[in-house]
Regions:
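Interface-prone segments of viral and bacterial extracellular assemblies
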Residues: 1-254
């Protein structure tokens, strides 16, 4: 689907036909396309006054897609696809029980130039600079480098648009005692990103977290669960690149 660009806000997730100057309005981010004689100029300034400029040769118009993508590109791809989500409040799970929660998950925004054959990423943006951080799970000399974000549970409405997506987590405690859970580490690149066109709703594939005990102690295995779209009009914008869909947290999860 595409829509002609007029004097509206051009920031809903969608594909736009651009044939003149436009502004794209995202939180803490300024984006402009300028029509030139031989194509288009692209300009972006973020909340920290970092700027980028690019040129797009074209005769008359371009197709611009705005879509959420996995939070793995900024500040650089150095984590082997792992993400470390630290809960602002620990969750207590009683013995031998299951609970389901919904949490915020950070996203980035991709700006794509679409053609009949492909959709090429022109730029990728984070509307919250605090998401562009690294964290270490485990010990300094042998731990896992991860993208890091502090997150909270979602109780009713969708979280801040363009900054967060929604994810459901089913926690299964197989132990005979209660456990406190304060963090989740898993390969985000195994997940897909889903969004609704002309909207700001975003969902990421869900998780199942299994707490169990073996000879090494208490562990938590996190496994991807495919988001059930229930026939709704969800689009897939980022299908991930990693076939590994699970991770065992054997260095603590409280």
């Amino acid at each position: 689907m595409s829509s002609n660009v007029e004097k509206e806000t051009y920031s809903f997730y969608d594909t736009y036909t651009v044939d003149s100057d436009i502004d794209i309005k995202l939180p803490r981010t300024k984006i402009q396309f300028k029509k030139l004689d031989n194509g288009f100029a692209y300009f972006r300034e973020d909340s920290e006054q970092n700027t980028i400029e690019k040129s797009i040769p074209s005769m008359k118009s371009i197709q611009v897609t705005i879509a959420p993508v996995l939070p793995i590109n900024l500040p650089a791809k150095k984590t082997n696809g792992l993400i470390f989500l630290r809960l602002d409040k620990q969750i207590l799970v009683t013995p031998e029980s299951n609970v389901e929660i919904s949490i915020k998950v950070p996203i980035e925004i991709g700006i794509f130039i679409k053609s009949e054959l492909s959709a090429d990423m022109l730029d990728v943006i984070t509307c919250e600079p605090m998401h562009s951080r690294f964290g270490l799970y485990g010990v300094p000399d042998g731990g896992n480098l991860c993208m890091y974000s502090k997150v909270s549970q979602i109780y009713d409405k969708y979280p801040e648009p363009y900054v967060w997506a929604k994810m459901r987590i089913t926690i299964k405690n197989e132990l005979k005692q209660g456990v406190k859970i304060g963090k989740f580490v898993f390969p985000i690149t195994a997940h897909k990103v889903y969004y609704k066109q002309k909207s700001t709703e975003v969902h990421i594939d869900d998780l199942t977290a299994r707490v169990y005990s073996d000879i090494s102690g208490e562990n938590m295995e996190l496994m991807k669960t495919v988001f059930e779209t229930a026939g709704e009009d969800w689009q897939v914008s980022d299908a991930g690149t990693d076939s590994s869909a699970s991770f065992v947290m054997d260095k603590g999860f409280d």
